[in-house]
UniProtKB/Swiss-Prot annotation:
This is Transcription factor RelB homolog. Keywords: Activator, Biological rhythms, Nucleus, Transcription, Transcription regulation. Residues 129-138 have a biased composition (Basic and acidic residues). Component of the NF-kappa-B RelB-p50 complex. Component of the NF-kappa-B RelB-p52 complex. GO terms for biological process: canonical NF-kappaB signal transduction; inflammatory response; innate immune response; non-canonical NF-kappaB signal transduction; positive regulation of transcription by RNA polymerase II; response to cytokine; rhythmic process. PANTHER family: NUCLEAR FACTOR NF-KAPPA-B PROTEIN, TRANSCRIPTION FACTOR RELB. NF-kappa-B is a pleiotropic transcription factor which is present in almost all cell types and is involved in many biological processed such as inflammation, immunity, differentiation, cell growth, tumorigenesis and apoptosis. NF-kappa-B is a homo- or heterodimeric complex formed by the Rel-like domain-containing proteins RELA/p65, RELB, NFKB1/p105, NFKB1/p50, REL and NFKB2/p52. The dimers bind at kappa-B sites in the DNA of their target genes and the individual dimers have distinct preferences for different kappa-B sites that they can bind with distinguishable affinity and specificity. It holds the Pfam family RHD_dimer.
Length: 549
């Protein structure tokens, strides 16, 4: 205890008008100095009117009059001189008490009556100022979280050819890495940071998978940092190596023997509960203090990292859609190509804030986990006056993960959905309108006519025409006549349906013409008579046959 002075009260920024009530409430037994000051102050308040120029009468009536004349502290007064009188009186009384009682012995504490009393200095020796705030303890923070998706866990037999874990803010143009920072560690010469893999959920047991890459061994990554030089560190070439199911127990026991258990969760007998497709990175820092003891900082967990090859946790992505627009009434058949998905754990959502609807398809419409055949849902308002663009994305039902959206446009409903008016107009053309139009001869229509298709370039098969060409036409009036005897007449009449050959073969003339032979005449004169031999018969589809000998 010490005896406070007026300067001490001013240093404490305690308002003087409020000092008297505080001193009145002080127990004299606990604080003798303040108690005596409070007693003298209350006694002197009866004579305040004397100093203010107002002397009350003596006796009990004078005491009552003095109490009536006493002005409460803090009350509003019309005369400022009268209002300052109580404050000045209090200051004078406090100064008198402080002068009389400069030092007071501190009463001995209870339980030790034989200890000598100690003298304490006056309030003038009390240091004025604020104490320095306590320093914040050292801690570790993650400045760049690892990317949740896009990383495929590799087996040991695959080697270390996979890419490293990227940062959360990585893009195609710029790549970032997971990073940490040590805070309030400038006075520590060296800090060791250990990174390991743990479960996604509480109690964050040690995961059987391990870290591989730079500064990694036994599934752990350990680096030594000097906070006074550089408190930040980025983890480059850091990958995740998965183990087989039969090696889960051995991998966990090996890490526990190395003392890797940040949350003291221990091992688990039933290792089937381990989620092999998702992990977290746990960062823990340790250092040695001045006495040589090892201090551990609180472990820090990263965001979950999902295996890319797992359909339950992989990144969803729409590759292509066969249509980009459709009627606002819905029901349009749409083909959607995507990455590998689970048919029982996927949905296709159409959204435009605040509206959202799912497409209609069943598990049988998911083909080989990579294609979905669906029907579009109707838009919230089918009475559209202009096209409305919405967003289409995939959504996993278990963890509510979503893919990037693809644009889809809802078109206004057609007034003539079945084309009745178009058909009526096509059946009854208006000739006057066509002749008086901009293209009366149909030249522009011919120009706009689509080019012939692929099948239009093929000619009909000639086998059928050749087969029917030799048959007589029942409608031909000359079909009963025999064919002409000479080739010139034969080809000139166009008897056959097929065109004549370019070069007509000339029959040999040696076998044609009259042949003179010896014979008897009718008159018996023994003269020879010429006998004409007809040409050989003509075979259709071939050249002229040689004559019979």
């Amino acid at each position: 205890m010490f005896a406070p002075s007026l300067a001490a009260f001013r240093a404490m920024a305690l308002p003087i008008p409020r000092l008297a009530p505080v001193m009145k409430s002080v127990q004299p037994a606990s604080f003798p100095v303040l108690g005596s000051m409070a007693a003298r102050l209350s006694t002197a308040r009866g004579g305040r009117g004397l100093r203010a120029g107002r002397r009350p009468p003596g006796g009990p009536k004078g005491a009552a009059a003095a109490e009536e004349m006493a002005v409460p502290i803090g009350a509003a007064l019309q005369d400022p001189n009268v209002g300052m009188a109580p404050v000045n009186d209090d200051l004078e009384i406090i100064e008198e008490v402080m002068k009389e009682d400069g030092f007071q012995p501190d009463p001995p504490p209870p339980g030790s009556p034989h200890d000598p009393p100690k003298l304490i200095p006056r309030g003038l020796g009390v240091p004025v100022g604020r104490r320095d705030p306590p320093r914040d303890p050292p801690r570790l923070i993650i400045t760049e979280q690892p990317k949740k998706t896009g990383m495929r866990f590799r087996y040991e037999c695959e080697g270390r050819s996979a890419g490293s874990i990227l940062g959360e803010s990585s893009t195609e143009a710029s790549k970032t890495l997971p990073a940490i920072e040590l805070l309030n560690c400038q006075a520590i010469p060296e800090v060791q940071v250990t990174a390991c893999l743990v479960w996604k959920d509480w109690p964050h047991r040690v995961h059987p998978h391990g870290l591989v890459g730079k500064d990694c061994s036994n599934g752990l990554c350990q680096v030594r940092l000097q906070p006074h030089a550089n408190p930040r560190h980025s983890f480059s070439n850091l990958g995740i190596q998965c183990v087989k199911k039969k090696e889960i127990e051995a991998a966990i026991e090996k890490k526990l023997q190395l003392g890797i258990d940040p949350f003291k969760a221990g091992s688990l007998k039933n290792h089937q509960e381990v989620d092999m497709n998702v992990v977290r990175i746990c960062f823990q820092a340790s250092y040695r203090d001045g006495s040589g003891r090892t201090r551990q900082l609180s472990p820090v967990l990263s965001e979950p990292i999902f295996d890319k090859k797992s359909t339950n946790t992989s990144e969803l992505r729409i590759c292509r859609m066969n249509k980009e627009s459709g009627p606002c009434t819905g029901g349009e058949e749409l083909y959607l190509l995507c990455d590998k998905v689970q048919k029982e754990d996927i949905a296709v959502v159409f959204r435009k804030e605040p509206w959202e609807a799912r497409a209609d398809f069943s598990q049988a419409d998911v083909h080989r986990q990579g294609a979905i055949v669906l029907r579009t849902p109707p838009y919230r308002c089918v009475q559209l006056s202009e096209p409305v663009q919405v967003e289409v994305f995939l959504q996993r039902l278990t963890d509510r993960a979503r893919s990037r959206g693809c644009p889809y446009t809802y078109l206004p409903r057609e007034r003539d959905a079945y084309g009745v008016k178009v058909k009526r107009k096509r059946g009854m053309p208006d000739l006057l309108e066509e002749l008086s139009g901009a293209d009366p001869y149909g030249i522009e229509a011919k120009r706009r006519k689509p080019p012939p298709g692929f099948m239009d370039h093929f000619a009909p098969l000639p086998a059928a025409d050749e087969a029917f060409a030799l048959l007589a036409d029942p409608l031909d009036p000359l079909s009963h006549l025999p064919p002409p005897s000479t080739p010139q007449i034969l080809w000139g009449r166009s008897y056959f349906r097929t065109p004549p050959p370019t070069e007509t073969p000339t029959p040999p003339t040696a076998s044609w013409g009259p042949i003179c032979s010896q014979g008897t005449s009718e008159g018996g004169g023994g003269r020879t008579s010429p006998r004409y031999r007809p040409p050989p018969p003509l075979k259709w589809g071939s050249q002229w046959a040689p004559p019979h000998q």
